[in-house]
Amino acid sequence: LSSAGNAEIFVAASIDSKPRRLTINKSLETSPTWSPDGRRLAFTSDARGKPQIYEMPANGGPMRRIPTNVSSYCSEPTWNPIKENLIAFTAAVSGGFQIALYDFKTRSSQILTTVSQSAVEPTWMNDGRHLVFTQRQNGRMRLMLLDTETKKVSSLHVPDFGDASSASFVY
């Protein structure tokens, strides 16, 4: 949301409650994702100039940069619904974008995809193992399935299917 000209993170207890602003600064905060236990939020912020992944308590408090260390441009975090220690995100790598994974336990990241054209918008499936992401292929947007353990990527499209992006699942 934005009431001051820059995107900020807000929460509300219900549809009838007044939204409460969690981030208050001049940087842009976008793409919030809840931890599985509902106690933390991860999001994208350009507080240091370029987009990076941050986290904070869901009830407010200081935001802390997650040290992904794979790119100076990281965005679109998505928290694993089962494995609370894992966040997938989009990272700028070698002139394109790839899907990466951060592990809070090991405090390390790894690039999961090596597609020739950009991979963006990761979304976890409810099994906590697979991600669906958007890939640009020959000028078209396609949904792809990534097995995070084997790093195998499969297309979810049939040849005549049109553009598709921004997958979302209800659990």
Q: What kind of region is each of these model predictions?
A:
Residues 1-171:
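Sequence signature of WD/YWTD-type beta-propeller architectures
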